[in-house]
Amino acid sequence: MNYNQTLEFLFSSLVSYQEKGPEAYKPGLERITAFCKHLGNPQRNYFTIHVAGTNGKGSVSHMLASVLQQAGYRTGLYTSPHLRDFRERILVDGEMIPKQKVVNFVDKHYDCMKELGLSFFEMSTALAFDYFDQSDVEVAVIETGLGGRLDATNLIIPIVSVITNIGLDHMALLGDTLPKIAAEKAGIIKKSIPVVIGEKSD
């Protein structure tokens, strides 16, 4: 398959939030944990910064990646969703993952993805982890997809966690009050790992 055929295949065979909405949400780390073990746990081979929040997490992630790159670090950036091209989600030093890398990853691991029942986001996350490792990234900025505690990205052990703000969003999935939503996003906080909070409410 070529790149476009691969994407069409993935969108038609793996459940995606963009296509199905809330029914595509598959909380839990069991599937991504098993798949990353299958890959050799590539996410353990470089430093990571984890970013969550209701608003601003994409902008903060891009700014952090830019600063790190300018400081001389080989930098990965994983965000979602994309605007025009799926590859916008996965950048190394500002360059999108090559199309052939996406095709090769799917060709090699699709049977395992289907067996585990991965969602499209879980596949994308694992692809990013693997590509960053292959690209000898020194530090990767990883943006959560939805929430934090049960988000597929929460497999990482970051050097710092960032929570930009908390608002009433995805209430059907994360909870119907700010404290409930905050608890989900605070799930990216790890013991003995620094946390930066971007906004405080009175």
Summary of predicted features, one role per range:
Residues 154-165:
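Inter-motif core of Ras-like GTPase G domains
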Residues 1-53, 60, 66-71:
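Short functional linear segments
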Residues 22-29, 33-44, 70-156, 172-175, ...:
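ATP-dependent carboxylate-amine ligase catalytic core
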